[in-house]
Amino acid sequence: ISACLEIRRKVFIDEQNVPKELEIDDYDRSNSECEHFLITDNGTNVGTFRLIYDKPKIAHMQRLCVLPEMRGKGFGYAAMSFLKEECKTRGNSKITLGAQCHAIPFYESCGFVCVSDVFLDAGIEHRTMEYVL
């Protein structure tokens, strides 16, 4: 998990100015309902995301990020493809996520749809999105 947290620090805390106390939460301190995934490229850590299983048959994806210098190379799309297959294998019927508004076109291109109005999370505009498996 330390490699995942280091990437999140670089992206969310350093780049996006999210306060550390909001970025690091109870899901990072306990693994009971949360699983962290590291995105790598030939042994180099390039991104991360986590899945939370706190509702039956629904996986909630959070904290997808790719290091700035590695963006635009398909790692986000690869992660979303893996995410869908992993959740399907686990018997989930739906994936939800809170997307930063600037990232909505990316998630829409992966088949997600917006299901909420805009809300603020850590001072950043988000919308809830879903993908039905």
Which residues fall in each region the model found?
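Conserved acetyl-CoA-binding loop-helix of GNAT-fold acetyltransferases
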Residues: 66, 72-85
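Conserved GNAT acetyl-CoA-binding A-motif
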Residues: 80, 86-100
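Short amphipathic alpha-helix that is part of the acyltransferase structural core
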Residues: 1-26, 30-31, 36, 40-42
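Conserved catalytic-core motifs of GNAT/GCN5-like acyltransferases
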Residues: 96-98, 108, 113-128
